[in-house]
UniProtKB/Swiss-Prot annotation:
Coiled-coil boundaries: none
Assembly notes: Forms homooligomers and/or heterooligomers.
Gene3D superfamilies: 1.20.1280.290
Disulfide bonds: none
Gene: SWEET7C
Identification of the protein by name: Bidirectional sugar transporter SWEET7c
Superkingdom classification of source: Eukaryota
GO biological process, one term: carbohydrate transport
Glycosylation sites: 225, 235
């Protein structure tokens, strides 16, 4: 009979793989930003939230750099404020936990509660409200929602095998949020305008026949106001 510990280890390994996929799922978004050299209506909120996750720091730093380079001044200012707030908050938490909580159990409880809060925000951040307002899923990528669902489901199962409330709550809520996003995607997918190539149509010009004469008006400097402009005939000869 397979032991619960073995099952938990296998699920944990799968969860790590899916989590890595979750952090890589925004790659198509940032390829699009680089290609268009504009962040369009994408938001930095999901990226700013998940930078708190240690294993994704390098990947998220790359995303933030790309977003910063192609953002306007308003978005750059917002990112700076949020990142500075995160850094100050994490420093305050570290100092507070080390100095105020003197037992491992108490420290784990405080940090665990914070992980529940920020983990829940991470799952709920991909622009659900914007989809409802615009009735378009253009800026809520399907890949991110699918991987979020798989990631939350896997880690929920992992936490239930040997119950861990700090893993169960954010990931269980993550599954619900991902299902909501997938339902919204199914509802608004058909109403999302499809991108079409805008080919510029240049006006066609009729060919000029050989030995064509063109009559054009010519202004006369000696004429006074109200006088009639004279005309000149221009002969055009096209050599073969």
């Amino acid at each position: 009979m397979v032991s619960p510990d073995l099952i938990r280890n296998v699920v944990g390994i799968v969860g790590n793989v899916i989590s890595f996929g979750l952090f890589l799922s925004p790659v198509p978004i940032f390829w699009r930003i680089i290609k268009n050299k504009n962040v369009q209506n994408f938001k930095a909120d999901p990226i700013l939230v998940v930078t708190i996750n240690g294993i994704s720091l390098v990947i998220e730093a790359v995303y933030l750099t790309i977003f910063f380079l192609f953002s306007d001044k308003k978005n750059k200012k917002k990112m700076g404020v949020v990142l500075a707030t995160e850094a100050l908050f994490m420093a305050a938490v570290a100092v507070g936990v080390l100095l105020g909580a003197h037992t491992h159990q108490r420290r784990s409880l405080i940090v665990g509660i914070l992980c529940v809060i920020f983990g829940t925000i991470m799952y709920s951040s991909p622009l659900t409200i914007m989809v409802v307002k615009t009735k378009s899923v253009e800026y809520m990528p399907l890949l991110l929602s699918v991987v979020s669902f798989l990631n939350g489901l896997c880690w929920t199962l992992y936490a239930l095998i040997r119950f861990d409330i700090f893993i169960t709550i954010p990931n269980g809520l993550g599954v619900l949020f991902a299902i909501m996003q997938l339902i919204l995607y199914a509802i608004y997918y058909r109403t999302t305008p499809k991108k079409q190539d805008k080919n510029l149509e240049l006006p066609t010009v009729a060919p000029i026949a050989k030995d064509t004469s063109i009559v054009a008006p010519v202004s006369n400097d000696d004429d006074v106001n109200g006088s009639t402009a004279s005309h000149a005939t221009i002969n055009i000869t096209i050599e073969p």
